[in-house]
Design a protein with these regions (language model features):
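N-linked glycosylation sequons
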Residues: 1-175
Length: 175
């Protein structure tokens, strides 16, 4: 590590919910290490591309992280790159940690390529969530005797097995 600040990039879209606690725990550990080294910390929720990235004392950063929660939509990480680039240009030497949910929303390689360019020679550590792949249910069609939904998978390979439990407005099971 360096003596420069720590920048924590945090995936916080819908796909991060399954492994949210693990990501917050990892952020806590990173912040504790920065605190021991008396380093400032910048928290960058990747769902907020227009948010100004600012350096804070470790204690403040810890509170900021605990106030975050997963957003109920997909996050376009790419849109955050300009703000990250501005911050890195202004702050110079720093360590960067990306607490990834491991989900590619379609522009993952574009984000990684862009991040690689702006990070330059600064240390970058990517933490994968280690959680089971996320799924989303979309296009629900409710018919008289059945309900059909489409399942979106976070990663394209293989076949998944699982159970979907559907409830009506009165909390009674459907199907």
């Amino acid at each position: 590590g360096s003596n420069g600040p720590l920048v924590i990039l945090l995936d916080d879209g819908w796909s991060s919910a399954a492994s949210w606690e693990a990501r917050i725990k990892a952020a806590d550990e990173l912040i504790a290490n920065a605190e021991n080294d008396r380093r400032g910390v910048a928290i960058v929720p990747l769902s907020e591309p227009t948010r100004d990235i600012t350096l804070a004392p470790a204690g403040t950063a810890r509170v900021m992280v605990r106030q975050l929660s997963p957003k109920p939509y997909a996050v376009e990480r790419v849109e955050t790159l300009p703000a990250i680039a501005r911050f890195l240009k202004a702050s110079g030497d720093c360590d960067i940690a990306w607490l990834s949910d491991g989900i590619d929303t379609g522009r993952g390689s574009e984000f990684i390529e862009g991040l690689g360019k702006i990070v330059e020679n600064r240390p970058l550590t990517i933490f994968d969530s280690g959680a089971a792949p996320a799924h989303a249910l979309v296009a629900a069609e409710n018919a008289a005797a059945k309900m059909t939904v489409k399942v979106l998978r976070a990663n394209g390979g293989g076949i998944d097995a699982g159970v979907i439990r559907a409830l009506d407005q009165k909390n009674s099971p459907i199907g």
